[in-house]
């Protein structure tokens, strides 16, 4: 059985790790801290194919983290980009020449420790199912 198809507005969720510079008497200490990521797919969709009335999401679709990551205890070592990109999709269904994105497919986020690891996961719901 297939998974619900992702579309513009579907969510990507993850827990990123960002390096925060924690103040100390000996100078700032780079400290990896978890940061929740939650954003809606907003770009890189296929406007000519609709899923529940919205443009279909595919591998390469992007989203923005909202609200953006907030450093706790000090400034970020490198400010996060607060963006994710869908990296996996259906092996059998193409939309606009790209793999269709579905619920539970993965995305890379702005994680500092493993920026190319697919830590994010799509959360999509609806009646259109894709295998």
Predicted regions and their residues:
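Intrinsically disordered, low-complexity proline/glycine-rich segments
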Residues: 1-131
């Amino acid at each position: 059985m297939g998974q619900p198809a992702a579309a513009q507005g579907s969510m990507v969720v993850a827990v990123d790790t960002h390096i925060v510079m924690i103040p100390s008497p000996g100078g700032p200490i780079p400290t990896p801290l978890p940061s929740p990521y939650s954003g809606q797919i907003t770009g890189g969709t296929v406007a000519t194919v609709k899923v529940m009335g919205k443009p279909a999401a595919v591998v390469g679709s992007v989203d923005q983290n909202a609200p953006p990551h907030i450093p706790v205890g000090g400034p970020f070592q490198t400010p996060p980009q607060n963006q994710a990109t869908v990296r996996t999709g259906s092996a059998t269904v193409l939309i606009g020449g790209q793999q269709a994105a579905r619920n539970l497919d993965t995305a890379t986020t702005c994680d500092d420790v493993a920026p190319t690891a697919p830590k994010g996961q799509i959360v999509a719901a609806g009646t259109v199912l894709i295998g």
